[in-house]
Swiss-Prot record:
Keywords: ATP-binding, Ligase, Magnesium, Manganese, Metal-binding, Nucleotide-binding, Purine biosynthesis
Needed cofactors: Mg(2+); Mn(2+)
Gene transcribed to yield this protein: purD
Pathway it works in: Purine metabolism; IMP biosynthesis via de novo pathway; N(1)-(5-phospho-D-ribosyl)glycinamide from 5-phospho-alpha-D-ribose 1-diphosphate: step 2/2
SMART domains listed in its UniProt record: GARS_A (SM01209), GARS_C (SM01210)
Taxonomic placement: Archaea, Methanobacteriati, Methanobacteriota, Stenosarchaea group, Methanomicrobia
Source organism per UniProt: Methanococcoides burtonii (strain DSM 6242 / NBRC 107633 / OCM 468 / ACE-M)
Name of the protein in its database record: Phosphoribosylamine--glycine ligase
Length: 432
């Protein structure tokens, strides 16, 4: 079987690795904007092209006799790549454009949840101009300001160190109104966690919970990023997430897929639910229509079920006939990013990977030239420790990072006992 992966980041490197482990011995191909050495090493062939160039991607898929495509990033979904592939008779793991909209139009997503009585939304309003904007911000008091469109996780700002007062929140919202709608939401207090699921249009196969860390600097300071690292626990939960919390989060995702199915376009691919665990249970921060990055790198190395079987079940609508299983291990993923990331990243600097021991290595936004690897303006290399405990997995990941050299920055605190305990204590205080 010939399988194509779209995208050239760390998430796609993890997807490619999972496909390459298949006992079905698929021939793997890729379309990516820059040569990711981790993906290229696993491929029979690859095309360097814009991942949003639908005509070129479909043409390449036809040329190579591709039977299934795994679409990694969100941008190709937003331009209808899954639609074009399916219309060409090629199976796509990735939803069609009108249901992928749940990610790339946050205003539509909130209204969709409201219209379908799906639990988990905070108080919110969508604004296309300044009328009533200041009054609503003042009414809520503490707010989150979100551009409606795709921002790579970096456009959202919340009250606190990012927006010190309602005046700053108003000014930021006004700055986003140029060419886009703005979503103003109640700023929820709690701990964030991610639940991801393979979806075949009606059935969901859930992966272990993960907690991502968006802030650039240790102790959760600095600007938002695409994600500096993440961890998962061996029981599929998180130290601050109960079975009941997870049940409610999954029920929200199931209700969302059921409602999307009623639109006459089945949602086939990955549904990513980013939740915040509050005093009143899990609430939805956002939905994404693909694997998270870095969260894919936590869960895919644990996948026991053959990835080709999972992809086939997604495409054919038969996930209910497949037992999708994961190893009961803990993981810690840490990113090395260019110095100055995300605001003023150091570009075109060589990255040298030394002895990473037992860690897994996933290349992200880098490029290979003359046998050497260089940074771009985004996250460079991720390492993943896999062990029986989060603490042991963190040690594996951190030791690996220490042996990757270049003009790079990383967070040492992700997955450490101190940071994990801080999350647990925070939730204990909130639940009182």
């Amino acid at each position: 079987m010939n399988v194509l992966i779209i995208g050239g980041g760390g998430r796609e490197n993890a997807i490619a690795d999972a496909i390459a482990r298949s006992e079905r011995n698929p021939a793997l191909f890729a379309v990516m904007a820059k040569k990711n050495p981790g993906i290229a090493a696993l491929c029979e062939d690859f095309l360097l092209a814009k991942e949003t160039d639908v005509e070129k991607v479909v043409g390449y898929a036809r040329e190579k006799g591709i039977e299934m495509v795994f679409i990694g990033p969100e941008a190709p979904l937003a331009v209808g790549l899954a639609d074009a592939l399916e219309d060409a008779g090629i199976g796509a793991v990735g939803p069609r454009k009108n249901v992928a909209r749940i990610e790339f139009d946050k205003a539509w997503a909130r209204n969709f949840m409201k219209d379908n009585d799906i639990e988990g939304s905070p108080a919110f309003k969508v604004f296309s101009d300044k009328e009533g904007l200041q009054e609503y911000i003042e009414e809520l008091g503490s707010v989150a300001i979100k551009p409606a469109g795709l921002t790579g996780g970096k456009g959202v700002k919340v009250m606190g160190d990012q927006l010190p007062d309602t005046g700053a929140a108003y000014d930021y919202a006004v700055s986003l109104l140029d060419g886009d709608n703005v979503v103003v939401e109640e700023n929820l207090v709690g701990e964030e966690f991610t639940v991801q699921a393979f979806v075949d249009g009606k059935n969901l196969a859930f992966t272990p919970c993960v907690q991502d860390h968006k802030r650039a600097f240790e102790n959760d300071f600095g600007p938002n990023t695409g994600g500096m690292g993440s961890y998962s626990d061996s029981d599929g939960l998180l130290p601050f997430v109960t079975i009941d919390d997870l049940y409610h989060a999954r029920e929200i995702m199931k209700a969302t897929i059921t409602a999307l199915g009623a639109t006459e376009t089945p949602f086939k691919g990955m549904l990513y639910g980013q939740f915040i665990l509050t005093k009143n249970g899990p609430k939805v921060i956002e939905f994404n229509a693909r694997f998270g990055d870095p969260e894919a790198m936590n869960v895919l190395p644990l996948l026991k079920t053959d990835m080709i079987d999972v992809m086939s079940a997604v495409v054919n609508g038969t996930l209910d006939e497949l037992d999708v299983e994961f190893l009961k291990r803990a993981t810690v993923c840490k990113y090395a990013v260019p110095a100055g990331y995300p605001d003023e990243p150091s570009k075109d600097k060589e990255v040298v990977v030394g002895n990473i021991g037992d860690a897994l290595l996933f290349y992200s936004s880098v490029y290979e030239k003359d046998g050497k690897v260089y940074t771009t303006s985004s996250r460079a290399v991720a390492v993943v420790g896999v062990a029986n405990s989060i603490t042991d997995a963190e040690v594996i990941a951190q030791n690996a990072l220490e042996n990757i050299t270049g003009d790079l920055h990383f967070r040492r605190d992700i997955g450490t006992p101190e940071l994990v305990q801080r999350r647990v204590t925070h939730m204990e205080q909130i639940r009182r």
